[in-house]
Curated annotation (Swiss-Prot):
Multifunctional RNA binding protein that plays a role in RNA metabolism and DNA maintenance. Participates in the resolution of DNA stress and the maintenance of genome integrity by localizing to sites of DNA insults. Also plays a role in proper nucleolar organization by limiting nucleolar size and regulating nucleolar number. Mechanistically, regulates the nucleolar levels of fibrillarin and nucleolin, two key players in pre-rRNA processing and ribosome assembly. It comes from the Eukaryota. It comes from Homo sapiens (Human). GO terms for cellular component: cytoplasm; nucleolus. Residues 33-96 form a coiled coil. Residues 118-213 are annotated as: Disordered. Belongs to the RRP17 family. One of its GO terms (molecular function) is rRNA binding. Residues 170-182, 198-213 have a biased composition (Basic residues). Interacts with KIAA1191. Keywords: Coiled coil, Cytoplasm, Nucleus, RNA-binding, rRNA-binding. InterPro entries: Nucleolar_protein_12 (IPR019186). It is found in: Nucleus, Nucleolus; Nucleus; Cytoplasm. This is Nucleolar protein 12.
């Protein structure tokens, strides 16, 4: 009875066998495809660098555009203020004509608008003469029309763009260095002599014999 129980237990403990099968094509591709995968990784890295470079350039263009619009708006405001000052400071001219039977008389009245005297701008009256007043008015009209200074570029963006371009140039230089030795070897080979036919060789040998005789 004990022996039968042991036999039954041994039969129950058996497990199904595992069979491992290898795909020869995939195995060969894995063993021989190291160079191929390396080239693919390089291509992917170059494409990623190009995409990052495009994004940085796009950001830089947008920032420049925003700065240009801001500077243009400030300049337009300054020009509008200068036009208003010119309109207030300009001279007021009136002319009246009187017709007579023998001649015509024209009476012209010119009156300058003194902003400092009327305290329209809140300025104190100047102590000097008319020459000083005209110089001050000219300087006040010229100051708002000066060109505004440009803002400096973002140094972080320029550094990123320069680093990305340097990495791209390094990849291109490696490719050029690998291609040059083959050209040098091809250039060192001596030129091959042109092939001649049997009839040409016979003619040449016949001429040599006649010249020897």
């Amino acid at each position: 009875m004990g022996r039968n129980k042991k036999k039954k237990r041994d039969g129950d403990d058996r497990r199904p066998r595992l069979v491992l099968s290898f795909d020869e094509e995939k195995r060969r591709e894995y063993l021989t495809g190291f160079h191929k995968r390396k080239v693919e990784r390089k291509k992917a890295a170059i494409e990623e660098i190009k995409q990052r470079l495009k994004e940085e350039q796009r950001k830089l263009r947008e920032e420049r555009h925003q700065e240009y619009l801001k500077m243009l708006a400030e300049r337009e405001e300054a020009l509008e203020e200068a036009d208003e000052l010119d309109r207030l400071v300009t001279a007021k001219t009136e002319s009246v004509q009187y017709d007579h039977p023998n001649h015509t008389v024209t009476v012209t009245t010119i009156s300058d608008l003194d902003l400092s005297g009327a305290r329209l701008l809140g300025l104190t009256p100047p102590e000097g003469g008319a020459g000083d007043r005209s110089e001050e008015e000219a300087s006040s009209t010229e100051k708002p029309t000066k060109a505004l200074p440009r803002k400096s570029r973002d140094p972080l963006l320029s550094q990123r763009i320069s680093s990305l371009t340097a990495s791209l140039h390094a990849h291109s230089r490696k490719k050029v260095k690998r291609k040059h030795p083959r050209r040098a070897q091809d250039s060192k080979k001596p030129p091959r002599a042109p092939r001649t036919s049997k009839a040409q060789r016979r003619r040449l040998t016949g001429k040599a014999r006649h010249s020897g005789e």
